[in-house]
Regions:
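Second-shell loop/turn segments in exported
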Residues: 1-3, 18-20, 62-69, 109-116, ...
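Solvent-exposed, acidic/flexible segments
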Residues: 1-8, 58, 68-77, 118-122, ...
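Extracytoplasmic/periplasmic proteins that interact with beta-lactams or build/remodel peptidoglycan
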Residues: 1-29, 49-52, 225-228, 234-235, ...
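Short pre-catalytic segments that frame enzyme active sites
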Residues: 2-75, 87-88
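Residue-level preference for non-acidic, small/hydrophobic
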Residues: 11, 30, 38, 74-83, ...
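Surface-exposed patches in mature extracellular/periplasmic domains of secreted proteins
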Residues: 20-33, 91-96, 140-141, 152-153, ...
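Conserved catalytic neighborhood of penicillin-recognizing serine enzymes
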Residues: 36, 64, 89-150, 172
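Active-site beta-strand/loop architecture of penicillin-binding DD-peptidases
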Residues: 145-175, 184-273
């Protein structure tokens, strides 16, 4: 069985020596599951201890796997794809994302990450989702009668999930039988040339998944949250993995901060089977 000491040690070493140092993380998780059965093969959980003199500068220690450490808003592009599928809306249909800022009502303003550069304008729904346009995703939700409620639920930033649950949920989404397979198209396309995360893809291995950053930008959170979830090889997945790192709010923060460690684990797992 793959759930052995070598795999578990590899996960802990990746957390301790790489992920936590790279992001200045204070708590991190990794999970590896079998993509065909959803069986948990390995997990790791580390936390930096508080030091009375210098705050979060204590030693890194093994800790029990916490159940509520991250939100689930990483899945919004995939839920948007499912909304389009359920409403029989083509990925090729044009959607106007405007200049990158959408005033929905007095209490809801949606901004794309490139709003300062003028947004994406008119693009296909597929392009909007592959570029993680929040306006494009919102309009995908609105193709369903209950889209507004679904949007509010999907963008809930409450810390209610963890790396194991993210991996299992994504695995179910990716393998859900569908004639259109919009979720698969978006999950794989994000790491291809037309996708926003194509520069983060591992070499020689087709990856399906997504990175996400949730930053403290609204005075409601005191921490930044880096997450990844994905499966590989995308055409016939053997593994689904997820990583979560939490740190006190600070800048800079880039979506690729976990990519080196994700790709190391992906390549290590694939080479292990050769």
């Amino acid at each position: 069985p793959l759930a052995d000491k070598e795999l578990i040690d590899s996960c802990y070493n990746l957390l301790d020596r790489n992920m936590m140092l790279e992001t200045d993380g204070i708590y991190g998780q990794i999970s590896v599951i079998d993509a065909t059965t959803s069986e948990v093969l390995a997990w790791a959980s580390l936390e930096k201890q508080l030091d009375g003199d210098c705050g979060w500068c204590g030693d890194m220690v093994y800790v029990p796997f916490k159940k509520q450490v991250c939100s689930t808003d990483i899945f919004v592009p995939f839920i948007a794809a499912k909304c389009l599928e359920e409403s029989n809306t083509s990925l090729g249909k044009m959607v106007d994302t405007g200049c990158g800022i959408l005033e929905v009502n007095d209490s809801l303003q949606i901004r794309d990450h490139n709003w300062r550069r003028g947004g994406y304008g008119k693009v296909t729904f597929e392009k909007a989702l592959l570029m993680k346009s929040r306006i494009g995703m919102y309009k995908a939700f609105m193709t369903l009668p209950n889209g507004a409620d679904l949007w509010e639920q999907a963008y809930d930033t409450i810390q209610k999930s963890n790396a194991i649950e993210l991996a299992i949920s994504f695995n179910q989404m990716y393998h859900q039988r569908s004639s259109l397979e919009y979720v698969k198209k978006i999950a794989t396309g994000i790491f291809e040339k037309t996708g926003i995360q194509h520069r983060l893809a591992p070499r020689g291995i087709k990856l399906a998944g997504i990175y996400n950053i949730l930053q403290c930008d609204d005075n409601k959170r005191s921490s930044d949250e880096f997450t990844f979830v994905g499966c590989f090889p995308a055409d016939n997945p053997k593994y689904t993995i997820s990583m979560v790192v939490v740190r006190p709010h600070k800048l800079p923060a880039t979506i690729g901060m976990l990519s080196k460690e994700v790709n190391q684990l992906v390549e290590w797992l694939m080479n292990r089977n050769l």
